């Protein structure tokens, strides 16, 4: 795909994205491919670094994001990416190669010899969910990830011997589901995340969902809260300072608390941490009323393990890509089911 030929459609996509008109921005396969070529590489590098950092932190604090030790090498890692697309697929493919060297593809010479592939379970079971149909793009990415690059017929023997795919075909299971996330039923959510610990991501997605509907997004997060297994992690990467207008902002005093926008952290804390958890004032109130309010407070089943208002994924200046690469700035939130 010639990057120069994409500039016209990229301008159109960018205009629609800035207006939050996602259906128009990504309404055709051509637009989705162009979006993947232009914006996904920078995002994928940022996403992979965030998850890798979370993995390292988990090892230090003795909890697991995605099992990576030699003893756990036979376990299948599980990731569910809500609002995901090509960037998530790129990020997790790179992360899998980093965490599991055994997931690497075989050299082209071995494949040419016709040796039978070893039967093994998948290292990573990944599900991507979005309202746009990313399946054709993801299928192409998966094929490119698990197939050795094409070499010239004049390539040297050493070049052929060292030519291998990023991943072996059996190492990654990538499934795409096309859903309106906020319309997913409880059964669909359960069937998607399963009953074992998994990493659930919302990369540059949750702020958009909350801006569409606070009640519907809150209800969806409660569905996740109800079904995610102990040890699961919800990881959010979003725009720095991403906020959601208060429903009462239009009628409230501009200087009042009611008029202030909600932050993602505040909205998620209320769902997952049961906040606000301030002590109930008892003065002038009956003991029974106070006891009932205390009893009705939600049980806290999550711990907040990451809260970074600003993070920058700074790229090496020597890194080159035919399209364009940028340093990505974002905020990170992560919650662990306990």
Residue locations for each model-derived region?
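Class I SAM-dependent methyltransferase "Motif I" SAM/SAH-binding loop
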Residues: 73-76, 80-89, 128-131
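Domain-level detector for long C-terminal conserved domains
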Residues: 1, 107-124, 130-338
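N-terminal auxiliary segments of SAM/dcSAM-dependent transferases
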Residues: 1-26
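Ordered, helix-dominated protein-protein interaction surfaces in large eukaryotic regulatory proteins
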Residues: 15, 37, 41, 49, ...
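A short secondary-structure junction signal
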Residues: 91-94, 138-140
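Acidic, Ser/Thr-rich intrinsically disordered and amphipathic helical segments
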Residues: 5-8, 12, 30, 34-35, ...
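Class I SAM-dependent methyltransferase Rossmann-like catalytic core
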Residues: 17-76, 87, 93-114, 245
């Amino acid at each position: 795909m010639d990057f120069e030929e994409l500039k016209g459609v990229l301008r159109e996509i960018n205009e629609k994205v800035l207006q939050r008109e996602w259906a128009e921005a990504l309404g055709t396969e051509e637009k989705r491919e162009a979006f993947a070529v232009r914006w996904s590489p920078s995002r994928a590098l940022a996403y992979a670094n965030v998850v890798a950092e979370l993995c390292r932190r988990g090892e230090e604090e003795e909890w697991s994001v995605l099992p990576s030790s030699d003893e756990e090498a036979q376990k299948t890692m599980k990731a569910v990416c809500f609002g995901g697309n090509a960037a998530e697929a790129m990020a997790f493919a790179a992360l899998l190669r980093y965490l599991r060297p055994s997931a690497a593809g075989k050299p082209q010479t071995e494949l040419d010899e016709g040796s039978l592939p070893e039967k093994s379970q998948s290292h990573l079971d990944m599900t991507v969910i979005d309202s746009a149909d990313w399946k054709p793009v993801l299928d192409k990415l998966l094929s490119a990830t698990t197939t050795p690059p094409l070499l010239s017929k004049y390539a040297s023997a050493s070049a052929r011997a060292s030519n291998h795919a990023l991943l072996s075909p059996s190492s990654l299971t990538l499934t795409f589901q096309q859903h309106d996330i906020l319309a997913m039923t409880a059964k669909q959510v359960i069937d998607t995340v399963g009953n074992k610990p998994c990493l659930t991501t919302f990369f540059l997605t949750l702020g958009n969902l909350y801006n569409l509907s606070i009640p519907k997004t809150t209800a969806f997060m409660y569905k996740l809260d109800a079904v995610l297994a102990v040890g699961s992690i919800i990881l959010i990467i979003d725009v720095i300072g991403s906020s959601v207008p208060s429903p009462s902002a239009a009628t409230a005093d501009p200087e009042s608390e009611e008029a202030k926008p909600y932050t993602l952290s505040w909205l998620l804390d209320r769902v997952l941490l049961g906040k606000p958890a301030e002590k109930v004032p008892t003065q002038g109130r009956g003991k029974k009323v106070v006891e009932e309010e205390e009893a009705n407070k939600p049980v806290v089943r999550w711990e907040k393990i990451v809260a970074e208002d600003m993070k920058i994924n700074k790229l090496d200046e020597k890194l080159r890509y035919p399209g364009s690469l940028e340093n990505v700035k974002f905020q990170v939130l992560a919650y662990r089911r306990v």
